[in-house]
């Protein structure tokens, strides 16, 4: 049940509130809480110098700042704590606050709790951003006022009073955002679940349980969209409280949306041809099938077809950069898991020179080697995980006698140079790292932009 935002305004006014993390979503949150009359203290590991102008702006607004080394030691004595998504609820600082009687929450939890519009929550190990974007575009095409947020778009909580009951809200939700989510989401989409973020989660089960929160608090009139080709998601119907619909790119029997003979169908109706979809690859067919099911009650087949035939994709996802000396370069920096890299490789019609590696999320790389070797002409590795990935390909050769040439470099510039030196006319070089970027870059966008800069300077 959606609650009246006036309740929150009354609740937060005059409260002693802590906000942990001065990042993209929390900056507008802090300003909004000040506007609502809260006494706000913002916490961050960065110094005032590192934060720059925003620290000065907050001081003018009367926001107290607790910054730098040991900043969480000072997280005590607050009535309300807004945590950053990646902060575990069982962290020492939050446990201390909870024991002191603090109400612990996050920007996304409060947004969903009080949002008047219909909420579509998209989660999964791969395909979240593209599926979220497709759902948003489908609803907008049909004429709905559509808001997009969560991991993408803009922070929405500070706009909550502008969102009307007839509006649609599409959220990309990570496992971190979902770990403490205990509110109803009207339409939940789970694209797939494979090993991911095991550096942050205690184990795979905790990761799965976090994902389940996207539909755990639904009621009988709500909708859950699941991937029938994924071993974990296909069984989620057993725990669903609302209506469940399924999609598959491989079979048609019992499916609510499916792919058959080059065409996409939803509830038995043909929507479009696979070859007419601008963004290529079977993983994008699955993203479209999921999105079609999510919006079926609101969006016409005509609008679905139009978006499929005109939407050119999201930056850093199998994005063509340029062709140099007969070699095509693609940026797939979003691929931060082996399964997402495999999906990207399958979008190409020939084996590619793959640039991979990065931050270690403690996921296995054997699937990349054992399922991807036919699509890899050579692999050039970089980052913290390069030895782990190299070991997976060595194991492939020892066990199956399949050799994939493996090279490695220290920087992105070096691996591009190596790839360029081994490429022949007609080859494809793609950055599809199978890892997060945090060992070398702030995020996957910065990594992708750097790659594009290097390629454009060849």
UniProtKB/Swiss-Prot annotation:
| Protein's pathway | Cell wall biogenesis; peptidoglycan biosynthesis
- The signal peptide annotation in the UniProt record is none
Q: Which domain of life is it from?
A: Bacteria
Q: Where in the cell is it found?
A: Cytoplasm
Give the Gene Ontology MF terms in alphabetical order: ATP binding; UDP-N-acetylmuramoylalanine-D-glutamate ligase activity
Catalysed reactions listed for this entry: UDP-N-acetyl-alpha-D-muramoyl-L-alanine + D-glutamate + ATP = UDP-N-acetyl-alpha-D-muramoyl-L-alanyl-D-glutamate + ADP + phosphate + H(+)
Q: What is its main location?
A: cytoplasm
Q: Does the keyword Nucleotide-binding apply?
A: yes
The record's annotation in Pfam families points to: Mur_ligase_C (PF02875), Mur_ligase_M (PF08245)
Q: Which NCBIfam families match?
A: murD (TIGR01087)
Protein's job = Cell wall formation. Catalyzes the addition of glutamate to the nucleotide precursor UDP-N-acetylmuramoyl-L-alanine (UMA).
- Quote the protein name from its UniProt record: UDP-N-acetylmuramoylalanine--D-glutamate ligase
Gene encoding the protein: murD
């Amino acid at each position: 049940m959606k609650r009246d935002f006036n309740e929150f305004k009354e609740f937060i006014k005059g409260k002693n509130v802590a906000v942990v993390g001065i990042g993209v979503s929390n900056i507008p949150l802090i300003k909004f809480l000040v506007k609502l009359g809260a006494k706000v203290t913002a916490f961050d590991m960065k110094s005032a110098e590192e934060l720059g102008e925003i620290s000065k702006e907050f001081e003018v607004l009367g926001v107290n700042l607790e910054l730098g080394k040991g900043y969480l030691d000072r997280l005590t004595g607050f009535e309300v704590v807004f945590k950053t998504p990646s902060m575990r609820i069982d962290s020492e600082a939050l446990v201390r606050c909870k024991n002191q009687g603090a109400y612990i929450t996050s920007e996304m939890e409060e947004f969903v709790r009080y949002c008047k519009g219909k909420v579509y929550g998209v989660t999964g190990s791969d395909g979240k951003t593209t599926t979220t974007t497709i759902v948003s575009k489908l609803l907008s095409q049909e004429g709905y006022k559509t808001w997009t947020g969560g991991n993408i778009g803009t922070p929405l909580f500070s706009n909550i009073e502008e969102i009307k009951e007839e509006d649609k809200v599409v959220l990309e939700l990570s496992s971190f955002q979902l770990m403490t989510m205990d509110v109803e989401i009207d339409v939940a989409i789970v694209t797939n679940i494979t090993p991911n973020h095991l550096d942050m989660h205690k184990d795979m089960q905790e990761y799965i349980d976090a994902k389940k929160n996207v539909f755990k608090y639904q009621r009988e009139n709500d909708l859950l969209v699941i991937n029938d080709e994924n071993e974990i998601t296909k069984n989620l119907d057993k725990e669903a409280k609302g209506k469940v619909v399924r999609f598959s790119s491989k079979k048609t029997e019992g499916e609510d949306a499916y792919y058959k003979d080059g065409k996409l169908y939803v509830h038995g109706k043909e929507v479009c041809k696979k070859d007419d979809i601008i963004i290529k690859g079977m993983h994008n067919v699955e993203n479209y099938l999921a999105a079609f099911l999510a919006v079926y009650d609101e969006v016409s087949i005509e609008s679905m077809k139009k978006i499929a035939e005109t939407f050119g994709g999201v930056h850093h996802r199998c994005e063509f950069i340029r062709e140099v000396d007969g070699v095509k370069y693609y940026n797939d920096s979003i691929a931060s898991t082996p399964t997402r890299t495999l999906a990207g490789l399958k979008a190409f019609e020939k084996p590619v020179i793959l640039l991979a590696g990065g931050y270690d999320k403690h996921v296995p790389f054997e699937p990349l080697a054992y399922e991807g070797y036919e699509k890899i002409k050579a692999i050039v590795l970089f980052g913290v995980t390069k030895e782990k990935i190299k070991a997976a390909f060595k194991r492939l050769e020892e066990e199956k006698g399949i050799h994939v040439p493996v090279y490695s470099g220290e920087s992105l510039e070096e691996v591009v140079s190596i790839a360029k030196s081994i490429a022949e006319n007609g080859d494809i070089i793609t950055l599809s790292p199978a890892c997060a970027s945090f060992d070398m870059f702030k995020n996957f966008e910065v990594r992708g932009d750097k790659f594009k800069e290097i390629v454009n300077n060849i």
